[in-house]
């Protein structure tokens, strides 16, 4: 019983938001109030505890999701502070995969911003219950109620407003608690806000408080039958009943509690911590994690209990200067101890648990074991990468992995000296282990190493880390768009025979395949292989070689040397020779037949399309729209936001280089924009011809 009690008091949460909404500042305040830090670290001073990489402290943004643990009112809160910059979506994606709940932080002036929408959708995908904290209410132009309305309009959320602000901008002194119908105020700038006063609601806010309290009860009645019954009969609710109903609605994903304050001015943070404990789920409140047996088909469940067999998911790899490779693991069930042997069921490899650490941003404490509900870092895992399942060898299970987006931008990188060449390969290997959206390939024609990622900032930081952490000095080329190739129609029964007779044993492999296009959405796989060979026409041991050969050929495409995506290859038939057939022969045949089939399947070029959002004064609207149209952009929506106009569009990434400067000069520096990857789309024929000619040197 004690173990279940302990688990009921655990909250695994993420703090997520758009860049600059004040996420890291909020986390720093949480650590201060829960007693982990004795001095508050400020982001703008480069001293935030959670931003521990050198680049984060210089740039004032969060890049990696730092994990830390704190105690509040008898509960253990494990927090993952995630980056808000779109180039680092992979960090957000993997955090959400292993969290039980989240706090979305909003800028009270800007409201719901593009990256907020993005993260909200990622959280929807993993069914993560979440609450909202409207921050920065001390800033000029802050508007709490507009922010709440944007949650409804843009996130399709059902906000449960639990607080309304007392005063805004420089007048902001506290909040009205709509459940207890009382005022909480933080007066005096000098204190760190540890103490707040509980007072009567100010007379001028009495009507607003009554109105929003009524709205809160109406919304609760809409999403909770027990409340509805009592509400219709006009009965009074106790504070406990209201809190229990909010908790039920939040955990079921039906509604989102909304609180407010100003983390930087130390206002509203403690009630937010109370809400994390009161409304976000413990590991016992979320459904048992689903997985499959090692056959990849039979469904299996793992309940969050220490009596179940051990199962955990590796969600992040980090290289530590002193400890080497650390693997972050969310333990879903059972117990795991230092030195125990586990199996990586995703790769079917045995692993030994070296040391187990409880991480606190970049400090750590060693532990002898970890149990269901824990988020830990493990030393000593050799073959485990992001998304792999670790489990008890006697009870294997494979948990659902994660899907990561394709990179959209690439640069060539050349080491300056021979010594740098060796360091570069080590650096690239380490960084690729840590970050699944960072890809590397060798350009066969130029002999250059080409690295690709999610945006210019992403690649900037990776190159910067190579310099700082691995002492690699390298020349970096101009950023290039990461085009892709695909096919538009299905071709059947394409065959290729690989035959070589040169004295002694020869080589022989014959394969027949069909090739068809797969849907090109971000959730779909970019390649599928199916084996439909019957009657032992190709021995089983050669089948993976055909697959491997085809995948090799896909890396270099057929039109212009860009990777081929969105294809399903079915191996239909073939033939082998008792003596002359080998894995190599079938690999070559797989590679050649893929190229032949793709050429016949109406190949096309794809380019990354970016969702671009421009915020501009009314008088510059015409220029902004004209400019987007001239970049082959498609306008999708226009709206008004806080006195400015917002234009949302889809624009090819290739047309967005240098946009910052152009927008600045067209609007005298008054407009701003953000962009994030949306999808891959077919390149118009005239543009495609130019790209292919340039790539093939014709």
Curated annotation (Swiss-Prot):
Q: Name one GO molecular function term.
A: GTP binding
According to its UniProt entry, one GO biological process term is: ribosome disassembly
The record, for InterPro entries, names: EF-G-like_DII, EFG_II, EFG_III, EFG_III/V, EFG_IV, EFG_V, EFG_V-like, G_TR_CS
The record's annotation in Pfam families points to: EF-G_D2, EFG_C, EFG_III, EFG_IV, GTP_EFTU
Q: What Gene3D superfamilies does the record tag this protein with?
A: 3.30.230.10, 3.30.70.240, Elongation Factor G (Translational Gtpase), domain 3, P-loop containing nucleotide triphosphate hydrolases, Translation factors
List the GO cellular component terms: cytoplasm
Q: Which residues form the signal peptide?
A: none
For GTP, which residues are the binding ones?
A: 17-24, 81-85, 135-138
Keyword terms: Cytoplasm, Elongation factor, GTP-binding, Nucleotide-binding, Protein biosynthesis
User: What range(s) does the tr-type G domain occupy?
Assistant: 8-284
Compartments where located: Cytoplasm
The source's domain of life comes to: Bacteria
Family that this chain belongs to: Belongs to the TRAFAC class translation factor GTPase superfamily. Classic translation factor GTPase family. EF-G/EF-2 subfamily.
NCBIfam families with a match to the protein in the record: EF-G, PRK12740.1-3, PRK12740.1-5, small_GTP
What does the protein in this record do? Catalyzes the GTP-dependent ribosomal translocation step during translation elongation. During this step, the ribosome changes from the pre-translocational (PRE) to the post-translocational (POST) state as the newly formed A-site-bound peptidyl-tRNA and P-site-bound deacylated tRNA move to the P and E sites, respectively. Catalyzes the coordinated movement of the two tRNA molecules, the mRNA and conformational changes in the ribosome.
Q: What is this protein called?
A: Elongation factor G
Organism annotation: Salinispora tropica (strain ATCC BAA-916 / DSM 44818 / JCM 13857 / NBRC 105044 / CNB-440)
The upper taxonomy is: Bacteria, Bacillati, Actinomycetota, Actinomycetes, Micromonosporales
């Amino acid at each position: 019983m004690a173990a279940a009690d302990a688990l009921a008091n655990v909250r695994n949460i993420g703090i997520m938001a758009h860049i600059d909404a004040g996420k890291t500042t909020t986390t720093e305040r949480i650590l201060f109030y829960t007693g982990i830090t004795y001095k508050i670290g400020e982001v703008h001073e480069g001293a935030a505890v959670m931003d521990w990489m050198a680049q984060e402290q210089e740039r004032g943004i969060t890049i990696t999701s730092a994990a830390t643990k704190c105690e509040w009112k008898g509960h253990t809160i494990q927090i993952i502070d995630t980056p808000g910059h779109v180039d680092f979506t992979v960090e957000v994606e993997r955090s959400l995969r292993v969290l039980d709940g989240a706090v979305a932080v909003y800028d009270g002036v800007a409201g719901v911003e593009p990256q907020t929408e993005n993260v909200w959708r990622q959280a929807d995908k993993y069914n993560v219950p979440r609450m909202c904290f409207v921050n920065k209410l001390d800033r000029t132009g802050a508007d709490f109620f507009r922010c709440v309305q944007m949650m409804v309009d843009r996130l399709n959320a059902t906000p449960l407003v639990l607080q309304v602000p007392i005063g805004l901008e420089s007048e902001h002194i506290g909040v009205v608690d709509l459940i207890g119908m009382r005022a909480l105020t933080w007066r005096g700038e000098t204190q760190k806000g540890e103490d707040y006063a509980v007072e009567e609601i100010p007379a001028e806010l009495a009507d607003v408080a009554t109105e929003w309290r009524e709205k809160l009860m109406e919304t609760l009645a809409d999403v909770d039958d027990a409340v509805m019954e009592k509400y219709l009969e006009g009965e009074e609710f106790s504070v406990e009943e209201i809190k229990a109903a909010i908790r039920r609605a939040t955990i079921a994903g039906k509604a989102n509690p909304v609180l407010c304050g100003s983390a930087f001015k130390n206002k509203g943070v403690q009630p937010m911590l109370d809400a994390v404990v009161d409304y976000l789920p413990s590991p016992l409140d979320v459904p048992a994690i689903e997985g499959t047996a090692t056959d990849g088909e039979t469904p299996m469940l793992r309940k969050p209990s220490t009596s179940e067999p051990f199962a955990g998911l590796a969600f992040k790899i980090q290289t530590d200067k002193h400890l080497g490779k650390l693997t972050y693991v969310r333990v879903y069930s059972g117990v795991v101890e230092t030195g125990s042997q586990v199996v990586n069921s995703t790769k079917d490899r045995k692993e030994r648990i070296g040391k187990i650490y409880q991480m606190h941003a970049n400090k750590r404490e060693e532990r002898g074991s970890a149990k269901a509900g824990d988020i830990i870092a493990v030393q000593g895992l050799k073959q485990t990468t992001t998304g792999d399942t670790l489990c008890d060898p006697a009870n294997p299970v494979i948990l659902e992995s994660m899907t990561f987006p394709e990179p959209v931008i690439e640069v060539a990188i050349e080491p300056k000296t021979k010594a740098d060449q060796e360091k570069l390969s080590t650096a690239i290997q380490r960084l690729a282990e840590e970050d699944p959206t960072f890809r590397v390939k060798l350009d066969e024609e130029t002999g250059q190493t080409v690295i690709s990622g999610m945006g210019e900032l992403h690649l900037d930081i990776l190159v910067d880390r190579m310099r700082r952490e691995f002492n690699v000095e390298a020349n970096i080329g101009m950023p290039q768009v990461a085009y892709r190739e695909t096919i538009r129609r299905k071709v059947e029964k394409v065959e290729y025979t690989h035959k070589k007779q040169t004295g002694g044993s020869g080589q022989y492999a014959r394969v027949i395949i069909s090739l068809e296009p797969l849907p090109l959405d971000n959730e779909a796989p970019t390649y599928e292989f199916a084996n439909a060979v019957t009657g032992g026409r190709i021995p089983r041991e050669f089948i993976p070689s055909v697959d491997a050969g085809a995948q090799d050929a896909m890396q270099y495409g057929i039109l212009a040397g860009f990777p081929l995506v969105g294809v399903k290859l079915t191996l239909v038939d073939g033939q082998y020779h008792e003596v002359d057939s080998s894995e190599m022969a079938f690999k070559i045949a797989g590679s050649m037949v893929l190229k032949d089939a793709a050429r016949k399947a109406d190949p096309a070029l794809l380019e990354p399309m970016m969702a671009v959002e421009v915020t501009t004064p009314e008088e510059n609207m015409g220029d902004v729209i004209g400019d987007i149209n001239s970049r082959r952009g498609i306008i999708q929506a226009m709206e008004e936001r806080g006195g400015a106009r917002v234009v949302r569009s889809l624009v090819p990434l290739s047309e967005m280089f240098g946009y910052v400067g152009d927008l600045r000069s067209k609007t005298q520096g008054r407009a701003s924009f953000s962009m994030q990857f949306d999808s891959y789309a077919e390149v118009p024929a005239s543009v495609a011809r130019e790209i292919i000619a340039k790539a093939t040197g014709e």
